[in-house]
Amino acid sequence: YKQCHKKGGHCFPKEVLICIPPSSDFGKMDCRWKRKCCKKRS
């Protein structure tokens, strides 16, 4: 997974499915933190 962040209600990059875990687990990007996942646009 690539890193992403939310800004202005949009996720960047918004064309891929990615997530950001809590900083304490920054090495693990397995998308179990659903609320921080950026979903691919339909």
UniProtKB/Swiss-Prot annotation:
SS bond partners: C4-C37, C11-C31, C19-C38
Record-annotated membrane-spanning stretches: none
Xref: InterPro entries: Myo_ane_neurotoxin_sf, Myotoxin
Compartmental location: Secreted
Gene Ontology molecular functions: potassium channel regulator activity; toxin activity
Repressor as UniProt keyword: no
Main location: secreted
PROSITE patterns xref list: MYOTOXINS_2
Keywords: Antimicrobial, Disulfide bond, Ion channel impairing toxin, Myotoxin, Neurotoxin, Potassium channel impairing toxin, Secreted, Toxin, Voltage-gated potassium channel impairing toxin
GO process annotations (BP): envenomation resulting in occlusion of the pore of voltage-gated potassium channel in another organism; venom-mediated muscle damage in another organism; venom-mediated myocyte killing in another organism
Expression sites by tissue: Expressed by the venom gland.
Subunit structure comment from the entry: Monomer.
Family of this protein: Belongs to the crotamine-myotoxin family.
Protein's job: Cationic peptide that possesses multiple functions. It acts as a cell-penetrating peptide (CPP), and as a potent voltage-gated potassium channel (Kv) inhibitor. It exhibits antimicrobial activities, and hind limb paralysis. It also induces potent blockade of neuromuscular transmission in young chicken biventer cervicis preparation and potent myotoxic effect. In mice, it induces myonecrosis, upon intramuscular or subcutaneous injections.
The protein, known as: Crotamine-IV-3
Species this protein is from: Crotalus durissus cumanensis
